Amino acid sequence: MGSMTLLFFVEHVFIFCMIFWLLTWVAEYFFKSKNNKQKHQFYECGIRALSELNIQINLNFSIVCVFLILYDVEFIFMYPFFFNFFLVNAGAFLVFFVFLFFVFYSLVYDSVQNSLALQL
């Protein structure tokens, strides 16, 4: 019974792979890539724009994104501590509070440097 199950699995994986292989051929036939002059040119730094749009994005938005990611990761590190609050020893409390100190220190440092002040 075990060898039949393995054979059945291998057959289905093979059929699945063949279907997707055929679908790639069909997709390549119907959806051909468009060639343009800039597609095959060399570039030194960045990609040349296809249009003359000059959109300026405010740097404060990217700074806010970096802060959100930074503090989100720090709170993810603190998340397991709250579920094991009664199971940890004094050493874990010390490590947690040192980590919490650095989180709040970085928040105070950001506010002193006016990094958190948005100027839209």
Curated annotation (Swiss-Prot):
The chain crosses the membrane at residues 6-26, 63-83, 85-105. GO terms for molecular function: NADH dehydrogenase (ubiquinone) activity. Keywords: Electron transport, Membrane, Mitochondrion, NAD, Respiratory chain, Translocase, Transmembrane, Transmembrane helix, Transport, Ubiquinone. Its main location: mitochondrion. It catalyses: a ubiquinone + NADH + 5 H(+)(in) = a ubiquinol + NAD(+) + 4 H(+)(out). It is a multi-pass membrane protein. GO terms for cellular component: mitochondrial membrane. Its EC number is 7.1.1.2. The keyword Membrane applies. It holds the Pfam family Oxidored_q4. It is found in: Mitochondrion membrane. Coiled coil: none annotated. Belongs to the complex I subunit 3 family. Core subunit of the mitochondrial membrane respiratory chain NADH dehydrogenase (Complex I) that is believed to belong to the minimal assembly required for catalysis. Complex I functions in the transfer of electrons from NADH to the respiratory chain. The immediate electron acceptor for the enzyme is believed to be ubiquinone. This is NADH-ubiquinone oxidoreductase chain 3. It comes from Paramecium tetraurelia. The gene is ND3.
